[in-house]
């Protein structure tokens, strides 16, 4: 299991294998993370559990049906369940351990920051990656 935590460690979690790993350039992720993009790892919901701090996770509905999670103590982004409840999406900076996976895609490059240039060879998608 991969362990992770927020900045203050009030929220601690463990996760199973990463099935999605990518950089999201949508304007909401850029605003929420205060960066050019958010690097997110997806794990199946049944392979995720909070060790401590589930009660410290607060949600903000950034768009209908989509919630962003954050720690009510330190304000760090926190793992959030997908709108269909099948996955947990974890901001990759929260991992304490090497997740054993690496990003494979850039998504929402159609709305990326104009001041950021993508210089790697990862696949790029204007919106969500094709499945």
Model-found features: residue ranges?
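A short Gly-Trp-Pro
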Residues: 1-131
């Amino acid at each position: 299991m991969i362990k992770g935590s927020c900045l203050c460690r009030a929220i601690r979690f463990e996760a199973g294998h990463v099935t999605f790993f990518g950089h999201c350039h949508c304007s909401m992720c850029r605003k929420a993370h205060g960066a050019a993009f958010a690097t997110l790892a997806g794990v199946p919901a049944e392979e995720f559990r909070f060790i401590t701090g589930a009660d410290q996770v607060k949600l903000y509905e950034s768009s209908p049906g989509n919630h962003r999670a954050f720690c009510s103590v330190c304000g760090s982004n926190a793992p959030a369940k997908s709108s269909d409840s099948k996955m947990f999406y974890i901001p990759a900076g929260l991992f304490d351990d090497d997740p054993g996976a690496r990003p494979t895609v850039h998504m929402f490059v159609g709305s990326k920051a104009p001041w950021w240039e993508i210089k790697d060879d990862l696949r790029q998608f204007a919106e969500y990656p094709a499945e």
